[in-house]
Structure formats: C-alpha cells, structure tokens
Amino acid sequence: MILIDGKSLSKDLKERLATQVQEYKHHTAITPKLVAIIVGNDPASKTYVASKEKACAQVGIDSQVITLPEHTTESELLELIDQLNNDSSVHAILVQLPLPAHINKNNVIYSIKPEKDVDGFHPTNVGRLQLRDKKCLESCTPKGIMTMLREYGIKTEGAYVVVVGASNVVGKPVSQLLLNAKATVTTCHRFTTDLKSHTTKADILIVAVGKPNFITADMVKEGAVVIDVGINHVDGKIVGDVDFAAVKDKVAAITPVPGGVGPMTITELLYNTFQCAQELNR
C-alpha cells in the first residue's frame, strides 16, 4: 500500500513554486499578492486564513488579511471587493467562507473579477473548466487532488473513477477535471441508490461527504486508489470520510487524514495566486 503523503508533496511543490516566484519577481519586478477577507470572528476562518498567510510568506507571495466586523453589510463588502478588483497591485482575492447569514454568498462570489478569483468559484471559471480553457482558475481542492494523482503516477486515462459527493466546491469540479483527464466518471450523491454497487467498481475512489468513516472496507475494490477529502472531528481527533484502518490493507494507495488532501488545497491556492499575477501582467 502506498500512502499518498499530501504534507510531504505539498512541501516539495512549495519549494518549486518559491523558485518560480523568485525568478518571476527578478524578471518583472512584480510581487504576486493575495488579499483575504474575513467577515466576523469565526475562529476556524481565522485559523484557515492564518495558515494561508504563512504559506504565502514561505514562497515569496505577499498577502494581506482584511478583517471586517460581523455587522458589515453586503453592500460594504461588495464595495471593498470592487476596490480590490481595480487595484493593480492585488492579483488574487479570497473571501473566507462561511459569511454571516445576512450576506448573500453568491452575490459576493460573483462580484470578484474572474481573473482574481483565486478559489475558482466564479461562474466564468466554472464555465472555463467545462470548456477546458487554459485561463481557467481551477478550484483549489479538486486541483490538489489531480496534482496528487499526477505526482504519484496514478493514471486517470481510461480509469473508472467514482466521486462520492456532488458539492460545487469539490465533487462537481473534480468530476469535470477527471473527465478532462480522460477518465470515465460516476458522481454519486445522497440520492444515489445502492452506493456500494458503484464504489466497489472504482479504480479510483474520491470521497467528499463530511461523514466520519462513511466508506468501509466492503465498499472498496481490492487494489483501488482512495482519495479521502473529508475532515471530521470525532472525540478530539480529525478523521476522514473513509475508515482508514479498515481500508488501508485492501487498497493500492490511499490518502491519510490529516496530512492528505488538506495541505494540497493551500498549496494550490499559492499556485493559483501566481497564475493570477502572471495572467494579469501579460
């Protein structure tokens, strides 16, 4: 069994990116810059953004965090985004979710200039993904999954892939990326009947449902590759959507939780920020 070590791979990729960023800065005198916006005092949001700030510093990308009070109105937030859209020194914009209930998430996402939409959530980037447009900013977690498969030499062309979970953030975009990579893809969701009949046929199984230990050994094909996107808190520990202990001896390769997909998400955010800077300054 191969352990797909996202933490180690992420470290290697950041070192590669740091070299690229340094060369880019030397040749253009432009420093890529990411601005992250937090609305309110959600502790998890602050932790996530702090880790993104730290990662930016490691590769030579500038970052700025703007923290707004909980009572910030939607129009005030949209006005700030408009200012950042028109600031040529800012290349990438991230609004940390969740937002307070009185702010419409879609209005906020749609207001970010597609070329600065580092999360890849804007409808323009979603459409570009479908069309295989090279200017597409791909959503960070799905992009990280594809990078893991590629870096570990796991072939997608001709593979039968089952994605469990159909969210806009992971399930749908990773399904599209896999289609683009010439895989045959089945996307399962909560209305899928007889889920096991699908998962046991998968050469590659990707799980993103937010249910601890949801995938058990009897749901996985012998010799499959399993990518566990889940992050669940159980009895003070972080566990995935896959019962790792039961599944690991049955599969060819598997991601751990923590230390699998999670670190790759932040690394791809850095790569997207660099892509934003390059595209905006062509």
From Swiss-Prot:
Coiled coil: none annotated. NADP(+) binds at residues 165-167, 231. Transmembrane segments: none annotated. PROSITE patterns: THF_DHG_CYH_1, THF_DHG_CYH_2. One of its GO terms (cellular component) is cytosol. GO terms for molecular function: methenyltetrahydrofolate cyclohydrolase activity; methylenetetrahydrofolate dehydrogenase (NADP+) activity. This is Bifunctional protein FolD.
